[in-house]
Structures are given as C-alpha cells and as structure tokens.
C-alpha cells in the first residue's frame, strides 16, 4: 500500500474513532523502502477489485470435442478435448501486464470439470436456476454482503449466481453448467468411483466415515493431482516444437512394438499421439494471445504501451515454438506451462519448486550480457507473484473453505543443496525474496530449505522477509527432507544426489525430484524439477480426536446419530484398553478409505488421464507412459493425512491422568461431561470457534470440577513427558501402520501431518474432548503446534516436546508460532528470529512458520475486514488474505499463543 493511500485510510478511520492498525508497522518501518513497482501496485489494485469468477468456456469446448471423438482411444480422446479447450480460450491482457495469460478469460477465476465430479451441480441445478431467475430483482446493496470476503462471491447478486461459496457465475451460464453436468451423470470419475466403491463389503463404513467428517473428502475425484512439484525442464530445454518432434520420432519407433513390456508397451503409441495433440493446443493458445497483443498494439496510441505490446507479441510467438532466449521469455514460458498444468485437472498445490535455480541460467546470461538489470528482474518477479495469486481452484464449498481456504498452494522453494552437495542459494533467489518483500501477495508462498551450508546473509535476508508478517518463507529442515526421500523411495532407486532435488509440493508435502542437464547457448546447467506422483492424494485428513470420541462412545457419532464403527462393547476399564480400541478403529478407517481411494484413482487414471503433467515430468516421455501407468520416476507418493494430533494427545493425557492414574473421575463421568459439553453451548450456536467467549448454560455447577480438571491436565508443549510420550508413541505407531497401507500402485504409504484448514470443519463436527476443548471449537492446528494457550513454559519447552520423536521418518510435521512484532524488531531481532529457527531445526524439527502480528490487530480486522484488505496471515502451511478466511480459522489464529519474548 502506498504511503498516500495509507495516510488517507488512517485519517478516515481516525475521524470515526477506529484504531488504524496496519500489518506489522513495527517491522515494516525497518524496511519502508520495500515497495512494489508502480506497475505491480496498479495490477494488485486490479486483483483486489476482481471477484473469483467461474467460467464455462473451457468446459464447453472440452465437452464438445469429447463427444465428437467418442470411440477414440481414451488417452487420445482426452488429449483432443484438452486441445480444443485450450485452442478456444479467449485471450485477455490487462493494461500494464508484462507476464500474460491466465486460467480463464477472467483475471481471477476457474471453471468446473463435470467429467471429474458433477453431483454438486446436478443436485443444486434447480436451486441455481431459481437463483438465476430471481436475481433480476436483487439490488446493488447486496454486493456489500460479501465485500468483507475479499474476492469471494459468498452470495448471489445482480446478474451473478454464487457457486460453491466462492465463485460468481453469470446467470446465463448456469443452464449450460447444469445441462453439461447432467450429461456426465453415471460417467464422471466421481460416479464411476461410487459405483465400484459400493462393491466393497465394508462400503457402509466408508460412507459413515465421510458423513461424520472423520475423513474430510475423497481425493480420487476431488483433487486427483497436485501437492507435488511441477517440472519445467522439457519446454525450457527443447521448446514446444522440440517436444513435438521427440514425440513424433518416438511414435515411429514404438508403433506396434511392445518392446518386451507386454500390453502396456502398446500404450506408448497412443501416449505420444496424445502429447502431440495437447502441445498443438497449447501452441494455439499462446499464439492467440500473441494475436490479441498485436491487435492491442494496433489500437494503442501511447508509444510506450505500444512498444510493450510489440514486445509481448515477439515473446509469445517465440516461446510458442522455441527454447526461451531471455529471462523474461523463460519466466513467461514457465508461467504459461504452469497454467496449462493446473487447467488440465482439478488441482491444488501444483508447486513451482526450485524456481530461482531453474531460471538461473537465463538470469546469469542476461545479466552478463547487460540485457536486463536487477531492478527489472525484481519487477518481473513482482508481476509473476500477482499472476500466481490470481490462480483459483474450482472445488466444492467444503474443499474450498474447509481445506484450501481459497489458497492454491503454489509453493516456491529456495535454498537447499545442489546435486553435488554444495549450497543451492544464488543471486536470483535473493531477488525472489526481495520481490516477495516488496510485493506481498499470498502466492507463491516461499519455503526455505534450511541447510547449514547456506550463506548467513542469504538466511538473514529470508528472516527479514519473514518478519514482515506475510508468513513466508516457512522454514523446512533440508536434512530431514533428504532423509525421508532416501527412506520412502529406496525401492525406486533413490540416491543421495537425487534426494537433494526434493522440494515442497502443496503447502508442506515433501515431494521427490530429479536433476536434468539443461543447455543454454552452449553452457550446461543442472536444474531440479519434480519427478513424482501427487504427494497428497491418498487418505485425506483423518480426524484424530473424532476417532477417540467414537472409542468413548462405543463407535457411535451422537451428533449425527450414526453407528460408525461396530460397537466394541468394552468397559474401557484400563488406559491400555482405550489405546487398543483406538488403534483398531484407526486401522479400520485407513484400510477402507485407502481401498476406496484406490478405486477412485484407478478410474481417474483410466478416464481422466493426465497428459500435460505426464509429458512434463521424467520419465514419462522416455518411457512412453503417462502417470497412470507409472511413467513418473517415483510413484510411492500417496499418503495418509491426519488432523488434530495435539488435541488428541492432550485428550489421551487427560484420560490417563484423571480416569486411570488418579481415578479422580470414572469413564462414565467423563463420557457424560463430553456429551453435555461440560455445561456449555456448542460453538456453532455461539458463533465463536476458539475457546474464547464460549457460553455456559448449566447453572448447577455439575460439570465444573471435571471441566477444570480437564483443562488443568498435562498438556503437550511444556516439555512434560507425561503428555509428550503419548505423542512419541503415537508417531512411531502411525508410521508403521501407514506403511502397511498400499496405494493403487502397490507402493507403501506414509503419514502426512498437516491440518491446512481442516481443523475448522472437523473440529465443528466433534464433541467436546477430554482435554477440555468444547464442542464445535477448532482443533489444534498443524501437527506439533501446541493447542492455543496451553504452552505455558515458553517456546523452547515447546521445541523439546515437538522433537521427542524422529520427524525425519515421515513426510512432514507442522509447527506454527505467533510472535508479537516488537519481539523481533531491528537487526538484532532478525538475528534472534534466525537463531530461534535454527534452534528448532537443529533439534530435528522438520518445519516452522511464523505469524508476526499482534492479536489486537487480528481482532480489529475481524470486526472491520474492509480496513484490512491487504492483511495476510499464516494458517497451516500457507498464507492467505485475512478477509478471505472463514471465521473458525480466524478464531483459531487469534487464539494461538502470542510470544512476546524469545
């Protein structure tokens, strides 16, 4: 925000006696020169004034061609449909843009994919049509109802229908969506998945787990791709024409030739044909933008703007065919390929990877030749940040709000090591940090792959960036990441050198990569890129406290009145018996969800085959096999995601202490207190989702003693082995149990321990818990963050608790800390923040991220969201605009312990 805008807003607020709290003024004042370029600020204003728009153009052309090519080989048929969709996308260039193209013809938005999932649109079809009919009488006043939600269209207005709680769609497009959705009934990945899932003998258990929110959502048709790292190598090294030529040559070599691979060898011919079809569609898409830029040039009267359009024409016409020549061309091509990738499927978390190292060849050579300055590079990176922030993912309201919080997790990793073990940091990565400090947008989020070999000044620069309060970079233990790579992918040939190529996919999913040798103007560079399947498509978010709830309630969900598990009918006379039943229920949940997910993903790979992401990542082009035929180098990537770990740990500690060790209460008394919410209203009734401001209704005091005892029971995060050992035992057990699960590729699975935003809705679906948490309130965030307000012994005690187990044996763990801005003010404060981070990572912690903001600012922003449009917070592995978060997550972030001294 410019100083003039800030002063104007402050004067307005002060006139109304409203406190003017801007994000982290204590720390921003240290870096008051960190302002985005005028061009970037103008485009950010466009973004802030743009609503998320759902558009039917891409699906219309996809569906039309798909029908037309009925009878063709499935992978080729899908390629032709994608080609038609890309070829017919309407170009839209915003004045001032130097990086162009987007998901749809709208600056911000996405589109539905009924071939993947259509049930929501069919079920809501009549309602949406009725909504569209009555909209003509709506007044413009209704616009203000969702103004506090940033770009989210939470309510219908004017000529616009709200869809999935986030997107607006023009009413004339609604009938097209409903008609198309009905065409896919019984044929979508979702419907076919349900059809075959029902053949499982324990299908009812799976449905019960979903209905009660023990499991958050199915991944096979909801978000089948993503939470992985893209690979830009082939377009960057060969150009799009080069890929087509490779595919044509390979087609000749494999036609009719099984080459000892059996029947799967015959699939290579069809895959290479599909690659050609899709690339041709992408080329048409790019060239359509070039034509549009040429048209804009022809009508532009300003000479400077005219030259900019001319430059765009030259860039787009070149990258549509050839290897990029300059840094700007390489940046444009990688962005274009990224959009192509996320348009192929329902995707969140298609992460960018080691971007500063990938684009370094062009940066180095352009700087040496004097073709570009550092300031020009920074501006381009600012513009890139805005374009990535514009990416939206179309999903159901439950997924968009309950998991993604509107974020798409396009994480960019910096630091780490090169193939030879030397530092991966370079000058371009420093400029990426600088651009992130000047142009503070939620996307792309940055992750520092911390290693002891990284230069001190580079780490200090990253700490300065974190201090500004954007929540990034998050800090990840590079040593832990490479150790996990070696463990999980040993059977697929992972080496130490290749393990160093990993990066973060999605918000916090450790994702395998590989090194490729790129040649630019005769000089060879080794660059990293993704080489694995989705690292987040598996069992999606088991609610740990909810499993414990059902143990106590004999397998029954009292909120929904559903008998989820078979009654165990055990008296739970001992703590060991509670643990035994918990493990049994947990294993049942993993088993049935894993098998259902395998069916969904198997149908997805057959009918919604990935072609763009397949051709990008090694070794699909070499093998002639797409993702679904394990063309990728690494395929043991599917996981079991969990939520609410610390709430569960604290609950076990309370049960053990109060019921079994001290015998202060019986198990029946505990169950009664839980069913009656310790005498309080449910959080959903109150409208507050943290433990603050809950309303007591019991006037007898019946539950006062047990409630106080539960709150006072041992809690994780205080270096107290009573609670911490419960976490340790759980983690050791969970890792083994997940390895027993098997993905559709017959590969072992592993734990993924992040909450994203699921701790909100899953907490809402859970009764009170034995730790004193009340019904409907949000779970603990992350996996090793303390439950809000329960870490009483300082941050270093929390670190001791978190590192009681070996965090390198699983995909991730998640630690969130909230620091008051004054705690890390000044240069010494920056050093203090870096030392704090080092302390945790050196102890074996995998991940740590910070919110540097005071709680009073957040409370005021909750009341006056329009005054804080630019305020961002770190949630759980991602950064998002405060005004676009749901209230349950806002309440949880406010409630987190705020450290004023470290």
Swiss-Prot record:
PTM description: Requires the activating protein CsdA to generate the key active site glycyl radical that is involved in catalysis. Phosphorylated on serine. Phosphorylation may trigger the formation of the active heterooctamers and thereby regulates enzyme activity.
Keyword Phosphoprotein set for record: yes
EC number: 4.1.1.83
Active site: 507 (cysteine radical intermediate), 509 (proton donor)
GO CC terms of this entry: cytosol
Pfam families in the cross-refs: Gly_radical (PF01228), PFL-like (PF02901)
Protein's UniProt keywords contain Hydrolase: no
One GO MF term attached to the UniProt entry: 4-hydroxyphenylacetate decarboxylase activity
SUPFAM superfamilies named in the record: PFL-like glycyl radical enzymes
Catalytic activity: 4-hydroxyphenylacetate + H(+) = 4-methylphenol + CO2; 3,4-dihydroxyphenylacetate + H(+) = 4-methylcatechol + CO2
Chain residues that bind 4-hydroxyphenylacetate: 348, 507, 540, 641
Domain Glycine radical: 782-902
Keywords for the protein's UniProt record, in alphabetical order: Lyase, Organic radical, Phosphoprotein
PANTHER family: DEHYDRATASE YBIW-RELATED (PTHR43641:SF2), FORMATE ACETYLTRANSFERASE 3-RELATED (PTHR43641)
Function description: Glycyl radical subunit of the HPA decarboxylase that decarboxylates phenylacetates with a hydroxyl group in the p-position. Active toward 4-hydroxyphenylacetate and 3,4-dihydroxyphenylacetate, forming 4-methylphenol and 4-methylcatechol, respectively. Is likely involved in the catabolism of aromatic amino acids such as tyrosine fermentation. 4-methylphenol (p-cresol) formation provides metabolic toxicity, which allows an active suppression of other microbes and may provide growth advantages for the producers in highly competitive environments.
Name assigned to this protein: 4-hydroxyphenylacetate decarboxylase glycyl radical subunit
Lineage of origin: Bacteria, Bacillati, Bacillota, Clostridia, Peptostreptococcales
């Amino acid at each position: 925000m410019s100083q003039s805008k800030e002063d104007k807003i402050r004067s307005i607020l002060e006139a109304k006696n409203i406190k003017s709290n801007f994000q982290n003024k204590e720390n921003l004042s240290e870096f008051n020169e960190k302002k985005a370029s005028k061009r970037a600020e103008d485009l950010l204003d466009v973004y802030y004034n743009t609503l998320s728009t759902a558009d039917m153009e891409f699906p219309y052309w996809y569906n039309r061609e798909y029908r037309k090519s009925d009878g063709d080989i499935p992978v080729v048929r899908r390629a032709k449909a994608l080609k038609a969709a890309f070829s017919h996308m309407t170009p839209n260039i915003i004045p001032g843009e130097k990086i162009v193209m987007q998901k749809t013809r709208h600056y911000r938005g996405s589109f539905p994919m009924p071939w993947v999932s259509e049930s929501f649109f069919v079920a809501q079809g009549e309602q949406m049509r009725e909504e569209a009919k009555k909209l003509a009488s709506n007044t413009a006043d209704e616009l203000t109802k969702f103004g506090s939600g940033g770009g989210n269209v939470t309510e219908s207005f004017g000529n616009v229908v709200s869809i999935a709680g986030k997107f607006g769609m023009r009413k004339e497009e609604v009938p097209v969506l409903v008609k198309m959705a009905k065409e896919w009934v019984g044929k979508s990945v979702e419907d076919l998945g349900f059809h075959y899932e029902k053949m499982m003998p324990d299908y009812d258990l799976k449905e019960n787990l979903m209905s009660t929110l023990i499991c958050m959502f199915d991944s096979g048709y909801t978000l089948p791709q993503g939470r992985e790292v893209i690979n830009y190598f082939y377009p960057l090294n060969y150009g799009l024409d080069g890929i087509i030529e490779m595919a044509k040559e390979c087609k000749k070599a494999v036609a009719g030739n099984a080459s000892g691979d059996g029947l799967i060898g015959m699939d290579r011919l069809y895959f290479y044909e599909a690659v050609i079809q899709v690339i041709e569609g992408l080329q048409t898409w790019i060239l359509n933008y070039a034509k549009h830029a040429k048209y804009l040039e022809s009508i532009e009267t300003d000479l400077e703007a005219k030259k900019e359009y001319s430059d765009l024409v030259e860039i787009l016409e070149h990258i549509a065919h050839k290897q990029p020549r300059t840094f700007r061309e390489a940046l444009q091509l990688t962005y274009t390929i990224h959009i192509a990738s996320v348009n192929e499927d329902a995707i969140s978390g298609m992460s960018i990877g080691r971007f500063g190292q990938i684009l370094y060849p062009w940066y180095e050579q352009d700087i040496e030749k004097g073709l570009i300055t550092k300031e020009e590079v920074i501006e381009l990176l600012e513009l890139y940040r805005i374009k990535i922030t514009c990416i939206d993912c179309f999903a159901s309201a439950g997924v968009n709000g309950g998991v993604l919080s509107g974020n798409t997790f396009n994480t960019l990793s910096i630091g780490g090591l090169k193939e030879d073990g030397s530092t991966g940091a370079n000058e371009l990565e420093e400029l990426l940090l600088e651009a992130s400090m000047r142009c503070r947008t939620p996307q792309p989020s940055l992750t520092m792959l911390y290693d002891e070999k990284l230069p001190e000044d580079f780490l200090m620069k990253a700490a300065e960036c974190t201090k500004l309060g954007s929540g990034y970079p998050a800090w990840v233990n590079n040593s832990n990441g490479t150790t996990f790579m070696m463990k999980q992918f040993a059977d697929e040939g992972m080496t130490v050198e290749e393990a160093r190529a990993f990066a973060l996919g999605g918000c916090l999913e450790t994702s395998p990569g590989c090194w490729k040798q790129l040649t630019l103007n005769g000089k060879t560079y080794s660059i990293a890129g993704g080489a694995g399947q989705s690292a987040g498509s598996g069992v999606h978010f088991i609610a740990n406290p909810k499993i414990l709830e059902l143990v106590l309630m004999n397998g029954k969900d009292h909120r929904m009145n559903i008998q989820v598990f078979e009654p165990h009918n055990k008296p739970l006379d001992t703590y060991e018996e509670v643990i035994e039943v918990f493990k049994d229920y947990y294993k049942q949940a993993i088993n049935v969800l894993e098998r259902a997910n395998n069916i969904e993903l198997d149908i997805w790979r057959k009918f919604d085959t990935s072609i763009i992401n397949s051709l990008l990542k090694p070794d699909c082009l070499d093998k002639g096999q797409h993702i679904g035929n394990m063309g990728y180098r690494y395929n043991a990537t599917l996981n079991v995601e969990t939520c609410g770990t610390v709430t569960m740990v604290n609950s076990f500690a309370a049960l053990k202490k109060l019921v079994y060790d001290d015998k202060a209460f019986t198990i029946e008394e505990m169950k009664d207190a839980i069913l009656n919410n310790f005498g309080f209203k449910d959080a959903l009734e109150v409208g507050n989702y943290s433990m603050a401001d809950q309303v007591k209704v019991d006037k007898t005091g019946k539950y006062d003693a047990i409630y106080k005892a539960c709150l006072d029971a041992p809690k994780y995060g205080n270096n107290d082995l009573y609670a911490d050992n419960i976490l340790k035992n759980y983690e050791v057990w969970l890792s083994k149990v997940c390895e027993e699960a098997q993905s559709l590729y017959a590969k072992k699975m592993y734990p993924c321990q992040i909450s994203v935003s699921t701790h909100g809705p899953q907490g809402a679906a859970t009764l009170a818990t034995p730790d004193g948490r009340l019904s409907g309130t949000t779970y603990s965030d992350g996996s090793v963050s303390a439950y809000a307000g329960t870490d009483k012994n300082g941050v270093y005690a929390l670190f001791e608790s978190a590192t009681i187990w070996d965090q390198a044996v699983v995909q991730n763990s998640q630690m969130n800390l909230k620091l008051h801005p004054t705690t890390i003010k000044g240069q010494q404060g920056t050093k203090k923040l870096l030392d704090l981070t080092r302390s945790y990572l050196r102890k074996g912690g995998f991940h740590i991220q910070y919110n540097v903001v005071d709680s009073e600012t957040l409370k005021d922003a909750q009341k006056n969201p329009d005054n804080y449009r630019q305020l961002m917070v770190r949630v759980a592995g991602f950064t998002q605009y405060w005004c676009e978060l749901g209230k349950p997550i806002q309440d949880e972030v406010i409630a987190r312990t705020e450290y004023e001294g470290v």
